[in-house]
């Protein structure tokens, strides 16, 4: 069954409480302070000093725990935010209103000979903020983001200027995204911001990158379980562990030292640092 907000048969139902995908601030002030766990749960910090690990905020003993298997992860995740995060027995189900869905995977193998493995998180997004590049067309972006052409056409009728150089990225470089082949279509002006509803998943590769809407093959993610999660060189997140529903704007992960993190993440471009206050004001104005 194809979801109304996606042209892909693999799209999963949304609750309506999903965040908008944006590169900022996660790819700027949060790039070296927030990992995949923080990003998926929406717990932004611009000064976190240690890697966030499920259960660590509650001082749960690791007991030689490795992230090559899923053992013990559910207990640790639920302990971090009791009453605000719930394990979903059916990963295909819709999250309840006010909640959004995340998925956890682990890496039994990697290219480094690492014996402890690693975890990785993905989060369902409800809309996208994207900056056009040379060659973009209405039809091409519709295929890339798995939406109807009318959705892109409507967004193209109300484009805006990017607020920062990185505003509108969906990968480290938008030109590296694997784009579906299309015939010549309606050309779009490069360097403009489009905002439109979508049903895709995003993730963040630890402290090494900003948020991504693409998998290891450069393709946008409709269902993380069907995406390429084998990074080379890197970890191979081949084992699906569980899906969770997360109360939006109510959770914290790891050693979150940013007092405004939970509030700010609900409007992702409101960067919570002094030198970005002007950017935040512009974003608020652009949404009116």
Predicted features along the sequence, with ranges:
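Small/polar beta-strand repeat architecture
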Residues: 164-196
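Cysteine-nucleophile protease catalytic domains, especially the papain-like/related folds used
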Residues: 2-84
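Ubiquitin-like/PB1-type beta-grasp interaction modules and other compact soluble beta-rich domains
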Residues: 14, 25-35, 96-106, 222, ...
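...with weaker cross-activation on analogous glycine-rich loops/strands in unrelated enzymes
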Residues: 63-128, 190, 195-208
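Secretory-pathway/luminal and periplasmic proteins that interact with or process carbohydrate-rich
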Residues: 118-121, 161-166
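Active-site or metal-binding loop neighborhoods of secreted/extracellular toxin and effector enzymes
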Residues: 187-288
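Primarily a LysM-type cell-wall glycan-binding module
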Residues: 128-159, 167-178
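Extracytoplasmic/periplasmic, Sec-exported soluble proteins
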Residues: 28-32, 114, 133, 144-147
């Amino acid at each position: 069954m194809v979801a109304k907000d996606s042209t892909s048969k693999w799209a999963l139902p949304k609750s309506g409480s999903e965040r908008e995908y944006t590169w900022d601030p996660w790819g700027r002030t949060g790039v070296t302070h927030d990992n995949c766990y923080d990003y998926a749960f929406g717990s932004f910090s611009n000064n976190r000093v240690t890697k966030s690990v499920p259960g660590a905020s509650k001082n749960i003993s690791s007991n030689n725990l490795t992230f090559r298997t899923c053992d013990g992860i559910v207990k640790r995740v639920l302990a971090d935010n009791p009453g605000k995060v719930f394990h979903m027995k059916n990963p295909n189900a819709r999250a309840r209103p006010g909640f959004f869905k995340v998925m956890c995977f682990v890496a039994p193998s990697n290219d480094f000979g690492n014996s402890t493995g690693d975890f990785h998180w993905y989060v369902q997004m409800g809309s996208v903020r994207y900056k056009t590049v040379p060659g973009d067309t209405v039809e091409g972006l519709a295929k890339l983001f798995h939406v109807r052409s009318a959705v892109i056409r409507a967004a193209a009728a109300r484009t805006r200027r990017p607020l920062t150089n990185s505003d509108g990225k969906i990968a480290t470089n938008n030109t590296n995204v694997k784009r579906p082949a299309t015939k010549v279509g309606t050309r779009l002006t490069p360097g403009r911001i489009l905002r439109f509803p979508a049903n895709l998943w995003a993730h963040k590769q630890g402290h090494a990158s900003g948020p991504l809407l693409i998998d290891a093959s450069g393709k946008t993610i409709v269902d993380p379980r069907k995406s390429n999660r084998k990074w080379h060189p890197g970890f191979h997140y081949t084992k699906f562990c569980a899906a969770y529903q997360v109360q939006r704007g109510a959770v914290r992960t790891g050693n979150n030292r940013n007092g405004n993190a939970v509030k700010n993440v609900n409007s992702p471009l409101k960067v919570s640092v002094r030198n970005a206050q002007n950017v935040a004001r512009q974003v608020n104005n652009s949404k009116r």
